[in-house]
């Protein structure tokens, strides 16, 4: 009798799971139908709208949560991302603009959001095309061009490449590219390194023209490019270690330490407690800008309370907190949003998803990986992510555009073809790494540091997640009645239950 009851219980749970999975698949199908209905599909690249659902079901991690703004935006952003996957005679690319723009290189390629494309795309199951995309920038983008294309914009390619390989290990690929990453770093030094050791950049080539502290002709030392170059040096050192090249490991480890100290000594404003731009002539620019949060994206600042106080500016409505998201400059700045027409490309205050996603990543790193992290909390992070998700709208329909009015949510380029489906930021990666808290490693360890609380969500699931060649499924279910996997946090690896715990807290699983 006990055996029969056990079998019946197992059948009940199995049928409940199948039913829940079918409901999720139906929900995704409904989302895609709605997205397709709203789109005139002016440009078709590798994956058409009619194939979008099948591609998504085969390739993306499936996600479910009680917050419908976040859930819908998660699928909308994957639906939008696949629009930009494009074949070329020199490999598969990921475009930034869906329609051709004048400042692009061949095949409508632009390097500005390259790092974002790799961080987002690394979670796609069939993602080998991203290696072609990386190789395009390393070996093909500048050929037969009248001006440099790869270095047309600041980049954190080595860091993003390592991030990609933390999800999809390939040490041979890393070894084959290491010397070229070294050469490219040295090229950046020749082009942008100042006598004091910091890097300078025009704001337009940081992807943030008409900024408060920058310009198109001034050689200012910005927190953005210096953080990128620090992150790149750290990544190259780690790649060198992975492929047993101690000489390059020592070189870049030392370089990263030196650059880090230069940033701390030269770009940190002790009085305003913020990382700022150092002017070509003179000291620090007085204004706080969102690029001052980027150092935490790369874990550059030490774990000290003084540095953490910079994050007090994020929830402050006189700082960066606006009704529709994170502003690019502090709102108390007297010249906030006074440059240009207010409808061109101006990063003197308006919301720019490129930096919104960077800021969220920096904040999540601060909360997850720093001990002295009391300036903000997980509720502040959730508010920013929810706001970011909710901002994806125009006329009541899902939309992602170029940049946005911080008070009204108006997309300032309107429904302009160049703005539509603008692929300039991450979103799925924010949900997977920052909110749910999957922290990819170079070794076969699945580490999770959740930053969403049971007060916000009493359930969520993230399934068919490919990580280190394993199929991961994660379920959070307070009552156990949603997924019938048991109460609490349950994790499956290749279909086998590998961990279950009552609370939504940090955990690790060895995948060997």
Question: Where do the language-model regions lie?
Answer:
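Alpha-helical support elements that line or immediately flank enzyme active sites
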Residues: 101-131, 291-303, 356-369, 375-381, ...
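Acidic/polar, glycine-enriched structural segments that form the non-catalytic walls/loops
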Residues: 19-105, 171-173, 182-187, 238-247, ...
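Non-catalytic carbohydrate-binding regions of carbohydrate-active enzymes
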Residues: 243-279, 308-470
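C-terminal beta-sandwich/jelly-roll accessory domains of carbohydrate-active enzymes
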Residues: 458-512
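Extended glycan-interaction surfaces of carbohydrate-active proteins
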Residues: 71-106, 123-147, 187-221, 261-351, ...
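The feature captures the catalytic groove of carbohydrate-active enzymes
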Residues: 24-44, 51-54, 143-156, 186-254, ...
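Substrate-binding cleft of carbohydrate-active enzyme catalytic domains
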Residues: 24, 69-72, 76-83, 106-143, ...
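Bacterial Sec-dependent N-terminal signal peptides
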Residues: 1-22
């Amino acid at each position: 009798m006990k055996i029969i009851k056990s079998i019946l219980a197992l059948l009940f749970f199995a049928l409940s799971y199948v039913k829940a999975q079918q409901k999720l698949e139906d929900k995704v199908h409904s989302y895609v139908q709605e997205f397709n209905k709203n789109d005139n599909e002016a440009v078709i690249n590798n994956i058409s709208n009619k194939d979008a659902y099948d591609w998504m079901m085969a390739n993306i991690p499936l996600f479910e949560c009680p917050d419908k703004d976040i859930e819908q935006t998660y699928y909308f952003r994957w639906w939008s991302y696949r629009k930009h996957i494009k074949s070329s005679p020199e490999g598969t690319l990921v475009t930034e603009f869906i329609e051709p723009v004048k400042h692009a290189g061949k095949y409508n390629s632009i390097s500005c959001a390259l790092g974002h494309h790799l961080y987002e795309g690394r979670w796609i199951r069939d993602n080998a095309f991203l290696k072609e995309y990386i190789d395009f920038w390393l070996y093909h983008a500048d050929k037969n061009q009248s001006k440099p294309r790869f270095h047309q914009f600041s980049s954190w390619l080595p860091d993003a490449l390592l991030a990609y390989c933390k999800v999809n290990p390939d040490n041979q690929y890393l070894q084959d590219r290491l010397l070229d990453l070294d050469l490219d770093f040295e090229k950046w030094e020749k082009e942008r390194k100042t006598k004091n050791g910091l890097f300078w950049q025009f704001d337009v080539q940081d992807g943030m023209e008409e900024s408060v502290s920058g310009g198109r002709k001034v050689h200012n030392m910005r927190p953005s490019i210096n953080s990128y170059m620090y992150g790149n040096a750290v990544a190259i050192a780690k790649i060198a270690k992975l492929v047993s090249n101690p000489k390059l490991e020592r070189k870049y480890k030392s370089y990263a330490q030196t650059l880090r100290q230069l940033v701390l000594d030269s770009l940190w404003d002790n009085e305003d407690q913020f990382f700022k731009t150092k002017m070509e002539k003179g000291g620090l620019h007085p204004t706080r800008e969102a690029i001052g949060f980027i150092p935490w994206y790369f874990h550059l600042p030490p774990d000290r309370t003084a540095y953490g106080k910079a994050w007090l500016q994020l929830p402050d409505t006189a700082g960066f907190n606006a009704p529709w998201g994170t502003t690019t400059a502090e709102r108390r700045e007297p010249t906030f949003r006074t440059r240009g027409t207010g409808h061109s490309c101006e990063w003197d205050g308006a919301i720019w998803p490129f930096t919104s996603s960077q800021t969220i990543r920096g904040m999540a790193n601060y909360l997850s990986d720093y001990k002295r992290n009391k300036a903000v909390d997980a509720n502040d992070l959730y508010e920013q992510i929810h706001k970011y998700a909710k901002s994806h709208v125009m006329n009541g329909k899902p939309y992602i555009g170029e940049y946005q009015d911080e008070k009204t949510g108006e997309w300032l380029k309107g429904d302009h073809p160049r703005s539509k489906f603008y692929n300039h930021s991450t979103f799925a990666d924010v949900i997977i790494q920052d909110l749910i808290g999957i922290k990819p490693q170079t070794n076969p360890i699945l580490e999770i540091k959740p930053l969403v609380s049971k007060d916000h969500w009493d359930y969520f699931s993230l399934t068919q997640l490919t990580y280190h060649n394993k199929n991961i499924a994660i379920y959070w279910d307070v009552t156990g009645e949603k997924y019938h996997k048991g109460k609490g946090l349950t994790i499956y690896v290749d279909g086998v239950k590998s961990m279950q715990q009552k609370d939504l807290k940090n955990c690790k699983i060895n995948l060997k």
